[in-house]
């Protein structure tokens, strides 16, 4: 039987497409693929899911969630399961970061109202628990995306400094 972590890792979180141009493409080379010939073009992150991770932590550390829009046609996925996040090496000296996935999962279990006793007793299916974890993850990230978007609208240079994202958490 697969663990909750393994089931969660097979998932691909959703995000609102309005953040693609306003946030994700500002900071990442989303949708371009990765190879050693890519130009960096001043992007802070490589893959779009890296911006998602940042947005998630902004929501988590702010203890704020924002539900995704109900219109499914305005919601997207990266097309890359969580278990694959941070597995690329050698892109501009990057190394893998599997522990970050573990920290995200642990935070979700800690902050999401899931009944692990009911799961252990077999009263609830693992997929239902994973659905709840994904919903929390998406809502935390959605708040974070909105936070980043608002900061950029107020001051397009807000995130230009090297410590800009760090300031968000301090």
Sequence positions of predicted segments:
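Charged, low-complexity intrinsically disordered terminal regions and linker tails
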Residues: 1-39, 65-170
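Short, basic amphipathic alpha-helical segments that act as recognition/interaction helices
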Residues: 35-70
């Amino acid at each position: 039987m697969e663990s909750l972590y393994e089931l969660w890792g097979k998932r691909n979180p959703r995000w609102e497409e309005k953040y693609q141009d306003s946030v994700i493409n500002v900071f990442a080379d989303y949708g371009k693929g990765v190879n050693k010939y890519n130009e960096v073009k001043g992007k802070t992150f490589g893959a779009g899911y890296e911006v998602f991770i940042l947005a998630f932590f902004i929501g988590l550390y702010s203890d704020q969630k924002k539900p995704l829009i109900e219109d499914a046609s305005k919601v997207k996925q990266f097309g890359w399961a969580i278990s694959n996040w941070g597995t690329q090496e050698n892109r501009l000296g990057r190394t893998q970061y599997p522990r970050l996935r573990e920290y995200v999962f642990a935070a979700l279990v800690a902050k999401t109202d899931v009944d692990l006793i009911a799961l252990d007793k077999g009263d609830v299916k693992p997929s239902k628990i994973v659905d709840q974890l994904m919903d929390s993850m998406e809502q935390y990230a959605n708040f974070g995306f909105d936070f980043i978007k608002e900061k950029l609208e107020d001051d397009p240079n807000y995130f230009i400094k090297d410590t800009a994202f760090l300031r968000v958490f301090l």
